[in-house]
């Protein structure tokens, strides 16, 4: 019998993300917005769009739409780099900080609810297995 592990993991990611989107809807944000805000917040100040896309692991054109939405919401600003007019630097606005804290609380609570009934050891084991799978895949890609 063929393993459905890949499909099972993909389904888990989809339903997890859908739950996060549902929980963030009252804040008019999505999981994609959160991942972007979180990475802008944790990286050194005024990263370029290229650096941010690499940190998130997506292509720059995919990032631009999300940044447009975050800028429209007043959570970030973008300005042209002085030494490279093609590049844009991203900065969180003062209004972003309380939103980031509120979203972090929603994400943390949701994560706790998702992991309810699963021991810390089980979570650690799962994380280690996922890491090993990822390393195996990276190794195979580099062959």
From Swiss-Prot:
Keywords: Activator, DNA-binding, Repressor, Transcription, Transcription regulation. InterPro entries: HTH_MarR-typ, MarR/SlyA-like, Tscrpt_reg_MarR-type_CS, Tscrpt_reg_SlyA, WH-like_DNA-bd_sf, WH_DNA-bd_sf. GO terms for molecular function: DNA binding; DNA-binding transcription factor activity. GO terms for biological process: response to stress. Signal peptide: none annotated. It comes from the Bacteria. It holds the Pfam family MarR. Residues 2-135 form the HTH marR-type domain. Residues 49-72 bind DNA. NCBIfam families: PRK03573.1 (NF002926). Transcription regulator that can specifically activate or repress expression of target genes. Belongs to the SlyA family. Homodimer. This is Transcriptional regulator SlyA. The lineage of its organism: Bacteria, Pseudomonadati, Pseudomonadota, Gammaproteobacteria, Enterobacterales.
